[in-house]
Amino acid sequence: MMTLIMLISLITSFIFMQMKHPLAMGLMLLIQTFLTSLLTGMFVKTFWFSYVLFLIFMGGMLVLFIYVTSLSSNEMFSLSMKLFFLSLSMILMFIVFSFFFDKSIISMFINNNEMNNLFSTNSLMMEDLISLNKMYNFPTNLITLLLINYLFLTLLVTVKITKKNYGPLRPMN
């Protein structure tokens, strides 16, 4: 599963370099962020960090989407056959490579006892529970409460500013 996600991530990276339309580039960045979040969640065995990472990237992408749509709203979008054949050939090369690749080399890395001890599920689950407890226990719960209050205050100020102008912050010409 992880190799498939890494393959798709590699293909979207190559496709991103060939894109010319800003909205298509934003879509590729969004797909890349989703795949990175999936990989991060698989490594850590909990999706806390990957969920926060995805939300932060989504917030940034929404701001970029607003800027891009206001700047290049009437630009035409066309699909390139060169890009399609490039991605198709990369997928076929990966399939052929996976059929002819020596499986014993892969099993040597997977069946390593040191790696199994390092990434045992019990130690990772206990580590995740301890790290979640640390966030809400005494020394760090003050920082969490401060962050919650700061975000709430920012929300109130933003609502007050937009209510005062009765519309968007940017004047329309």
Curated annotation (Swiss-Prot):
Entry superkingdom: Eukaryota
Cell compartments where the protein resides: Mitochondrion membrane
Entry keywords, A to Z: Electron transport, Membrane, Mitochondrion, NAD, Respiratory chain, Translocase, Transmembrane, Transmembrane helix, Transport, Ubiquinone
As given in the record, the signal peptide range reads none
Record has Transferase as a keyword: no
Might you give the EC number(s) for this enzyme?
7.1.1.2
For membrane topology, the record states:
Multi-pass membrane protein
Name the chemical reaction catalysed here.
a ubiquinone + NADH + 5 H(+)(in) = a ubiquinol + NAD(+) + 4 H(+)(out)
**What does UniProt give as GO cellular component?**
mitochondrial membrane
Q: Where are the transmembrane segments?
A: 24-44, 47-67, 81-101, 142-162
Query: Looking at its record, which EC class is this enzyme?
Result: translocase
Q: Does the keyword Cell division apply?
A: no
An example Gene Ontology molecular-function term: NADH dehydrogenase (ubiquinone) activity
Described purpose of this protein according to its UniProt entry: Core subunit of the mitochondrial membrane respiratory chain NADH dehydrogenase (Complex I) that is believed to belong to the minimal assembly required for catalysis. Complex I functions in the transfer of electrons from NADH to the respiratory chain. The immediate electron acceptor for the enzyme is believed to be ubiquinone.
Tell me its family: Belongs to the complex I subunit 6 family.
Q: What is the name listed in the Swiss-Prot or TrEMBL entry for this protein? A: NADH-ubiquinone oxidoreductase chain 6
Q: Which organism is it from?
A: Aedes aegypti
